[in-house]
Structures are given as structure tokens and as C-alpha cells.
Amino acid sequence: MLIDEQETRFYVAESTIPDGGNGLFTKEAMRRGDRFEVIGVLVRRDSLSDKCTHFCDHHKFRVGEDLLLIPMGIGGMANHSLTPNLSKVFEGERLFLELTEDVPADTELFFTYTEYAQEAFGLLDK
């Protein structure tokens, strides 16, 4: 499988969060409702494939009751915030991150991690 995103509205750079690693930023001003698809691989929860990809458990998105999406592109670069500018939108087995507000160019994009991910990254105490 070749992951070849053709998305040109974003770039990856050092996060504005101290010790946050890299983050996802806008190259241009964007409007509320603009969105992009989180590209990746779907695996069944608790399957052999899920167990074999445990190294990325903290980054998996739950899609419905039985599926997990392992992000392979820019969707996996958005960091956590309790005041996010992105929300998750599901369409069947597809996941999109959608802007919840207008943002200027060079804005870092955030969504709120699940409680599981917040705990795994040590964010619940912060």
C-alpha cells in the first residue's frame, strides 16, 4: 500500500506545545467547516493486526464499535488541546478532522484526545 497524500494546505513543524514534538499547521487561512481526511489503515479492535500494531496504540482512532484507524499521514500529526480548533467527523468507516473555527495561516491544529490517549501521554494531570 502506498500512502501518497496530495494535501497542500498543511505543513508539519515543531509544535507550539513545549516538548510536544511536531505539530500540524495551516499553510493558508482556513474557514470553519474546512476538513481533511485522516488517511491510514483500518484494523479490527482486539485482532491480531491490532496486537501487532501495539506500538502505535496511542495514535489509533476508534471508528465505530469494532474498528481502529492507524493514521499514516497528516491526520496523525495534530496534537491535543482541551481548547481544540478541530473536531472528529465520521462518515461510515472514514474519519475527517474538521475546523471548528476560522484560522489564519500558520496556525497549529489541535483536537481533544480520548481519555485513553490523554492517560497514555500523561496529559490528564496537566
Ranges and model annotations:
Residues 1-126:
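Conserved catalytic SET/PR domain of SAM-dependent protein methyltransferases, capturing the structural core
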